[in-house]
A protein has these predicted regions:
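Structural detector for short beta-strands of small beta-barrel domains
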Residues: 395-420
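Repeated scaffold domains used in trafficking and secretory/extracellular systems
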Residues: 107-113, 145-154, 184-191, 223-230, ...
């Protein structure tokens, strides 16, 4: 005796396109779920008899229907459109850079973030690894699709993926923080104080708030928008026709032309930087868009970064070379990576970290002494690192359930149905209960209470954000 129920959730604003399939085969219940058009994840359970299996299946189906899922015909909706950055990478003829260590992530790597204690790398296989600054592997997350980029927003670390979801990596288990509309062919994203900016293939920039609710979207004069940088001043958007600054409400503040299409963007406190297809890195003042620096490379620039406040400017081209410039535009050096072309990069404490076309996270010694030695053929002993057998912690909607919260143990929040949305508010003493809480979307259940490690006020002071672990209270 077998029966299958297939459901889909497709929100009117394009925020979610997911499926949920429940199959009952005698005493076994198999649940498959995920993004429409993808294979999804599978969970199975066996029950004492067919009646108990049916009852369990009906309960799961009922839960999803209450969340807005509805019966559908499998295969009618198609997978979201995905564009992946392609670099025809050639071997550099420059002198080899002083590489201290190189980690093999296993697939072309796009995502990178270098924090105070850890380095993060995300690749096309959906693997996100954490390492110490000396290259020791400390953790591994598994995401359902290829990683587009990794971004930091104060304490919070996020990974944007080809499945259209943005995952919060700040706890032991990855959780869905944002779901990007199905019609957005994502190129890049950035987050500031919970506000997410997304640039896409069509050249649009789209902004959503901490509740993952649409705020505004603006079509660009160009296409292929590989740059979006969110800041207190608004959003800086780079595409085939240059760089445009929009205020926080979506009004155009200024536009600056570039020599070539923008392929990458970086920002510092007072300036934004745009790497282009014609071998330039342009520096623009955030205040008015004036070009205050121009840095010339020998091939298309697919990544760039700076030291604090732009004292030094770094760039990576599609010929497996990296460059360093002084702020005034003087080229200080050009060296070979030895591990492909850099999809992205970040500088920290005289080290330049790259993620590359061959899947490496490479750490270069960018100190003047090390560079001078490399130019004379004296290189450090490079350490080659592999992941080994470290466990892969998968993204999940499952939450540990506890019976109660001990006095002083964390903060209690509650999910409340408000109109067509499920909001979250703090119920513990000492907090403003009218404020919303930024909280993972796919674990919200109306009426449920959760225990979170910590709740902090957003930088803008209008909502709360959770930090640490999340447990559901029974």
């Amino acid at each position: 005796m077998s029966a299958t129920t297939y459901l889909e959730l497709s929100e009117a604003d394009g925020g979610a396109h997911k499926f949920y399939e429940v199959r009952v085969d005698d005493t076994e219940v198999t649940i498959t779920y995920g993004r429409i058009g993808e294979q999804g994840q599978v969970r199975s359970a066996t029950f004492a008899d067919h009646a108990k299996a049916l009852k369990a299946a009906e309960k799961k189906i009922g839960e999803k229907v209450r969340k807005g899922y509805a019966p559908a015909v499998k295969g009618m909706r198609q997978r979201r459109s995905v564009s992946r950055r392609q670099i025809v990478s050639t071997r550099s003829t420059a002198t080899q850079a002083p590489v201290l260590w190189r980690f093999a992530s296993g697939a072309p790597a796009f995502g990178i973030f270098i924090g105070e204690d850890r380095a993060w790398v995300g690749n096309e296989d959906g693997d996100v690894y954490t390492l110490t600054h000396d290259g020791q592997v400390t953790g591994r997350f598994g995401l359902p699709d290829a990683v587009k980029c990794i971004v930091a927003d104060d304490f919070w670390i996020y990974a944007g993926c080809d499945d259209g979801q943005v995952y919060d990596l700040g706890a032991k288990v990855p959780r869905v923080a944002y779901e990007i509309a199905e019609d957005v062919d994502i190129y890049w994203l950035d987050i500031h104080d919970g506000v997410l900016g997304v640039s896409d293939r069509q050249g649009r920039v789209t902004v959503v708030d901490h509740e993952d609710e649409f705020q505004w979207s603006v079509p660009a004069s160009g296409d292929s928008a590989w740059m979006v940088r969110c800041a207190p001043e608004g959003v800086f958007h780079g595409h085939s026709r240059g760089v445009t600054h929009y205020t926080g409400r979506g009004h155009r503040a200024w536009h600056a032309d570039t020599v070539g299409s923008v392929l990458f963007g970086w920002q510092e406190r007072d300036a934004v930087f745009a790497g282009t297809s014609r071998g330039r890195v342009h520096r623009f003042a955030k205040s008015d868009g004036r070009m205050t620096g121009d840095y010339r490379c020998d091939a298309a620039v697919f990544s760039c970064a700076t030291s604090p406040d732009g004292e030094f400017v770094f760039a990576g081209d599609n010929q497996s070379s990296v460059y360093c410039f002084a702020a005034d535009g003087t080229r200080l050096w050009k060296l070979a990576t030895g591990c492909g072309s850099a999809f992205s990069m970040q500088y920290r404490d005289e080290r330049l970290y790259l993620v590359t076309t061959d899947g490496s996270l490479a750490c270069l010694d960018a100190s003047p002494a090390a560079v001078r030695a490399a130019e004379q053929g004296q290189l450090p002993q490079r350490q080659d690192i592999k992941a080994g057998a470290i466990a892969r912690v998968e993204a999940t909607a499952e939450v540990e359930v506890v019976s109660h919260a001990a006095p002083g143990e964390g903060v209690v929040v509650e999910c409340v149905q408000e109109g067509g949305r499920i909001r979250v508010h703090v119920v513990s003493d000492g907090y403003d209960r009218s404020w919303g809480v930024q909280f993972p979307k796919n674990i919200r259940v109306p009426g449920a209470r959760y225990l979170v490690t910590e709740v902090v006020t957003s930088a803008g002071g209008s909502f709360y954000r959770t930090r640490g672990e999340i447990k559901r209270l029974r």
